[in-house]
Every structure is written in structure tokens, then in C-alpha cells.
């Protein structure tokens, strides 16, 4: 992009991306090109005798982060002085506690579910009205919020609870380890259920209502504002130059949307990863009267995002590939192509509608009472010409699109914001058939960007804004995104999929009754149900 200086000036930005399964340090030039990346997998291990726990190992994970930073610098063949700024993003919901001297003392990952009993306990407060109060203020329910975890600590680890002086998110912990400064940003801290959607600041009254300490809330700074600078100690550990600016990052989904240029009211994205997120930018804070949809602060000040989640969509495809497609994996390896590409080629020869096969995996999002039916395929036939791996694979792709369309319809119903097009990103967007199916099911154009994993790019944009290399978050996101292809909906298929969606919804409702009666096991249940 001509408005940005080229890499010959020696200006680069670093994003630290702390995901559920790995941490990455990614270096970008000012045109948004990825120059290098260091990556390390990490594990969140359960605490012995604490069901559902997933501890975040602060010591090991900081060492892994430093390893990634050095790896990225080495791969890019750049001196540390070339990095003009660094920012961090992370999985949301994961929290870190610090003692009163600012030392990190405890952390859990986003998938930590130890506080199921505490979720139920908090739901009963104020004649079962506390969760509604939390949702109307923060856009979050209790199942994934920080308050049940804090209550668990008060019950079972009072030593840590008493020591705690500050709470942040995992992205903020990375920034703290670099700079020594403590703060949170609205996009990530909003997922604690303790931040006001309107003011974009903490709502300590919610903690007080729950009988929890409200004196552990750190300062709130917007994404893209300067937090501090890399300390001499951190520089020695990670290889960055002491004094390098450290800028506020944010939540992975919101920064991913920034990297995709999804920054204006009404814009919509489907992020196709392990989970699929359907995200719609809302012009002002509003919540869903039915509490089906999550509402998060965007990284763009004043804007919120309605977010629905399809559960384990990418994981389901991986399970199908690994459980049933050993032959295709070997063939793809010999051909030098991706197994999913081969499966898509096979599925493309199956008629739209997949001969009526109905996958039962993720439900539409019901944030207040979030659980799913038992995984299954319904309406199979014994005709091997019509019911085979290609048919089942196509049915899974169609079903993922149907669940996404249902979630987008729920958002439109309460917000009045109806998508006119969809940005499709993440690993799922690599599938050309899947992209076309998503266009056909939703009935609107689907745009696929060149950079499909845009979280780190969004984080780098925040770093650049924080030191004045970019003018503003929204403008830069729009300027840096590049499009690979666009899919127009097939109207004939749209009508077919509308009927399939209606049938699937009815069958799924029946399948939930089997879980309710204890005859089958839910794919997943939220803590406290």
C-alpha cells in the first residue's frame, strides 16, 4: 500500500498471539506482509483432584513466548532494533491474578471449567435474576465469566484469593511481562462479564452483588494505546530491545476482525476454526432479550459485536477425516495436496442437499442455556452410491453453513442488523466448496481474504497505531485487507437449503429431548447446567 512506508526503512511490528493451543510471535512489515513467525505449542494441564480445571502455566508459557520471539527475529534475520512496537492478543476468558506487588500468582485458560458449582450458585442470587443483570450490563452470561472462578478461589484457594491485588487477561499478562505495566483492554476484559458495554469500563457493582472483591480491577486502556516499554529484564529474557514500545492489544476474535477489515457497523464475519464464530458489528451496545447471543466490545471504540458460536465445527471435520478417511489421507499425500481439498473434490460431485443426510453436532447458540445434542448422522440410507464418505463430508459442510445462517438470523432478529455480505476467514475458508455452500445457504455474497488467519495482523495494526505508524485502527484494517475471491449465492440452492434448515431445526429439537431424558450424552454442556 503506497500510503505506508516500505520495509526498507527498517520499520517492523511484532504481534504476540496467545491461542488456546499455542503461542506465536509474528513479525509484519508496515504493508501487512508477514515476514516471520515463531510458534510453540503449550498445554493447559488439569490440577489433580480438581475436575474441569485447566491451569495456565505462567512460568513455562513465558519461557515459550520468549523462545518464539527469538525464533521470529532469527527467522526474519532482523536486529531487535527493527521492531518499532509490540502488542499482544490472546484467547478470551482466560484470566491472570497478580499479588499486590504486581507478581503473577495464578492463571487459568479459557477452557477451565472448574467452577460449574459456582456458576449454579451465582445464578440463584437475587431470585435467579443475577445472570440477567450481568448479561444486560456486560453482554456475557456466567458460564464463561470470571466471577465463578473467583468464587471458586474464595472457596478452595483462599490463600490465592486473599493475595490477589489485580486481575488481567492473558494478553495483558504478556504485555505486563514485557513492560511491567498492568492494564486491560475492553475487547478482552469484556469477556469476564464484569465490564460495562456502554462505558467500556469495569462495573464493580457486579462483583459486590456476588459478594466478591471489587478491589482487584486493573486500569482499562483502549486497544492501540501505548502501555509502556520493554524493560531491561524482559529484553534479556526475550531478545527484544529494551525501550521498545509495548502497546495494548486485545481479544483474538476482535483483533481478527480488525485484520479482516470488519470495522464498520453492519459488517459480518464467519470465522471458521475449531469453533465457528459468527460476528456482526452493531452500531451501538444492545443485548438479546432471549440471551441467545453473546455481545462483546469491539476493538473499535463505541462499537460492539454480536457473536454466536458453533461448537467444534472444525474439530468435527478433523474427527471425520481422521476416523474415516485414512485412504484419502494416503492418496492426498501421494498427490501432494491437502486431504480436505481431496475430500472437497469428492463432495463437489454430491448434489446439493447431500441426499437428505442431517448431521447432528453443534446447535445454534443459546447462551443462557447452552448445551448440544449427542453427535450423530440422521437420515442415512443403505445405498452406497448415495450414502458414502463424500456425501457425509458434504453434509457436514452444509450443516456448518446452516448453523451459521441460523445464528446470523438470531442476531438479525434482536438487533435489526441483517448482513448484506459475509467475510469468511479461518481454516474453513480455505475450502472453495465450503465457501460456495456458505453463500448458497445464507443467500448473500461471501468474500474470502488472502490472509485468512488475521488475528496477528490485527494485533500488529494495534501496535502500529500505538506508536503513530498508522493513523487509526479502522482505516488501517480496511487498507491492509486484500481479497482472494468472492462467491455469489446460487438462488436455486438457497431454496433447497432453506427447506433443509427447517427440517434440521425440527430434528435437532427432538434430539435434545434424548439428552434431557438421559438417553444420550450431550456434545458439550456449559458449566452450571
From Swiss-Prot:
Any one GO MF annotation of this record: autoinducer-2 kinase activity
Any Pfam family matching the protein: FGGY_N
Gene designation per UniProt: lsrK
Function field: Catalyzes the phosphorylation of autoinducer-2 (AI-2) to phospho-AI-2, which subsequently inactivates the transcriptional regulator LsrR and leads to the transcription of the lsr operon. Phosphorylates the ring-open form of (S)-4,5-dihydroxypentane-2,3-dione (DPD), which is the precursor to all AI-2 signaling molecules, at the C5 position.
SUPFAM superfamilies reported for this sequence: Actin-like ATPase domain
Protein name (database record): Autoinducer-2 kinase
GO biological process, one term: quorum sensing
Class of this enzyme: transferase
